[in-house]
Amino acid sequence: MSSVPVIPQARGLRHTGPVTVAVVSGPTAVGKGTVVGALLRSHPEIVVSRSVTTRPPRPTERDGIDYDFITPEQFDKLVDGEGLLEWATVHNSHRYGTPRGPVERAVADNRTVVLEIDLQGARQVRETYPQATQIFLAPPSWEELVHRLIGRGTETPEQQKQRLETAKVELANADEFDAVVVNDTVDHAVAHLVELLSL
């Protein structure tokens, strides 16, 4: 049996200054979508970048709201036309990406933009947009992360196993990020994000 990964502790930003683009990343089932959604509801002035993906929607997801669900061919056109700020193949299956245009328009309008993306995407944004503030959303414990993943009931046991292996890699690389927010409760995580983003 593999060992339980070390869970990063909460920490503040390593730098100061205004935050224009914020990356929120973290392992599967940590609650990225829930926390970012709650942040948007409490601060509608921010812009949350909507990702595109080639995976099918989960039962509770809506096309054009949670993600833009597109075909692999449509995704290829975006990649070829440099229409994505970042993209990655996640969990060795489906592709996800951040459309470039909406992010650039929001930045031009002096609005804070939040990108909810995985570790691979965060690394690409670090290269292409180094001024972005990178925030890692961590679970309170490994056991809680496993509980959340199994509890949502949207993946097969094999998919759960793959996602947990990916989560171990993501947790091991949390130190790459400018700050860590622990999602013990949504309210606490949102309050920490508000503080980090100076909203």
UniProtKB/Swiss-Prot annotation:
Keywords assigned by UniProt, alphabetized: ATP-binding, Cytoplasm, Kinase, Nucleotide-binding, Transferase
Kinase among keywords: yes
Catalytic activity line of the entry: GMP + ATP = GDP + ADP
Signal peptide interval: none
One GO CC term on file: cytosol
Enzyme class label: transferase
InterPro entries: GK/Ca_channel_bsu, Guanylate_kin-like_dom, Guanylate_kinase, Guanylate_kinase_CS, P-loop_NTPase
Annotated localization: Cytoplasm
Domain Guanylate kinase-like: 19-198
EC number(s) given by UniProt: 2.7.4.8
Domain of life: Bacteria
NCBIfam families xref list: guanyl_kin
Free-text function comment from the UniProt entry: Essential for recycling GMP and indirectly, cGMP.
Family: Belongs to the guanylate kinase family.
Name of this chain's protein: Guanylate kinase
Gene: gmk
